[in-house]
Structures are given as C-alpha cells and as structure tokens.
Amino acid sequence: TARSVTATPLHSAREAARAAPSLDALRALLENFDGCALKSTATRLVFADGNPQARIMFVGEAPGRDEDIEGLPFVGRSGKLLDRMIAAIGRDRSTAYIANVIPWRPPGNRTPTPQETQICLPFIQRQIELVNPDVLVTLGNPSTQTLLSTREGITTTRGKWFDYDTGTRTIRPMATLHPALLPPPPAYKPLPRQDP
C-alpha cells in the first residue's frame, strides 16, 4: 500500500531553500513561505542589508522592533553599534552583508523557539552559500550556536575561528558578542577651552 507523505514545514523549508538559484529568488521564496508562524505576526520580512558580493557576512539572531518597521537588519541601537564594529575593521555596510538566522520579528522580541529556528535555518544556510563570503561573523549566542552547531556559549566561542561547510566550500566563521551586549559608546563631551 502506498503511504501518504505530508510535507512538514521543515521539509518544505529545506526544499524551497535548496531550489533558490539566487538571493532574489531566495527572498521571493521567503516572502511566499507560510511554514513559519512568525511571518503572520511580523510587519515585514527582514531579509538582508549590504553588499551581496561582500567578502564578510554578519549574521544575528532575529529582527527587533526597529528592524521589523524598516525591513532591514540591525537599524536600531544594535545597528549603530554594529556599524561601529564594522568601521573598526575599516569597512562599512556597503562592504559587508548583514542578515539574521530568523527573518521575521518574534512577537514582543521574544526568543525564537527551537522549531522556528530549525524551520528558518535552511534559508540562512542557503543565503550564506549564495553570498559565499570569505569570513562569516556570528553575532551573539543564538546565531553562533545555530550556525556553528555548538552548545558552547559565546564567552567560550568568542574570538575563535571555526570551519563552516556550505557544501561547496569551507568558510571561516568567527563568533563575537551581539552588539546589544556591548556597552554604549561614551557620550561626547567637548573639552573645556584652554586659553594659552
């Protein structure tokens, strides 16, 4: 007797992601993908920002309120701090590519469930493969543990190089703190004028 096979959301995500020949196609697939409940509670898809030909790619966990409104990753306070991190290595957003493991904001900025993360994982994996960066920077514990398949925390993995196999090549990822965990930059205080 023939068994009826019902595609699970995870199976559908894997098949859809695998079929995307380009970043534009992947974005279109995500816009039409209904296998993750977060899509229905988010304002919009937050796909990526920056240069798709960049040699360095940054990946965080999920969009926040500001990102959900603007449709771009890392645009709020964390975005300003990420911009400073990128500037510290002599680059800016036009020379980097920025995305999240989860492309939709979880309600109330809650932590995505393991199921939501697993459903979205094939899409970010395909996005990494299509961007094909030389260096992948995971921002914070959730993206590090998800993409690098480790249970070690960010305090242990931070600053260490790993290997990430895309299926076609190995990329060098490094884990670092999420910008939200960094202290805010010191307030600018002008020096008192000193007359000679």
Question: What do the PLM-derived regions correspond to, one by one?
Answer:
Residues 1-196:
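A polyanion-binding, active-site-adjacent surface
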